Regions:
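Helix-rich interaction surfaces within compact, conserved domain-sized segments
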Residues: 97, 115-123
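Positively charged, polar, low-complexity stretches
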Residues: 2-100, 111, 129-132, 136-141
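Short, glycine/charged-enriched secondary-structure capping and boundary segments
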Residues: 47-49, 102-105, 121-122
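Trafficking entry modules
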Residues: 104-113
Length: 141
């Protein structure tokens, strides 16, 4: 069963997604990042090129011929055929249709109240379906 991890109070979703992608790549996991829009997907694509001066995180947009062998795939379309099913990083305000295909889902919730309200709805929906949930609040130890 898919494990769902909620990460809340995140000041910058793109930077946080880059950190998760970097950590996943370091542990040899394969990641799909679901962006809210094409613009956000393109911004994440650009941000991953600049994570650090010493790290390179191989990534492509979904649909790229290299997607099956690339550890990080970015998309704004949850209905596209995806090559990986280890981890899904959800940057959207909705429950992805395909979340159960993944071993693990990271729900990234910003400081924005509307984003937090939608995140709470998703948390309740996952809980009603008996998915294992964890909750990490940024800034708390």
């Amino acid at each position: 069963m898919t494990r769902i991890d909620f990460h809340t109070n995140i000041p910058d979703k793109l930077s946080y997604a880059c950190r998760l992608a970097r950590k996943a790549y370091g542990s040899r996991a394969k990641v799909v990042v679901l962006a809210e829009s094409r613009e956000q997907a393109e911004a994440l694509n650009a941000a991953l090129w600049n994570v650090s001066d010493t790290d390179f995180i191989p990534h492509v947009m979904a649909g790229d011929p290299l997607a099956p062998q690339t550890p990080v795939v970015i998309t704004d379309n949850e209905d596209v055929a995806l090559p990986h099913h280890d981890m899904l990083v959800n940057l959207t305000r909705r429950t992805p249709n395909n979340f159960a295909q993944f071993a693990r889902v990271f729900e990234i919730i910003s400081l924005d109240e509307a984003d937090a309200a939608e995140g709470r709805k998703r948390y309740v929906a996952y809980k009603k379906q008996s998915y294992p949930l964890t909750h990490f609040v940024a800034g708390q130890t």
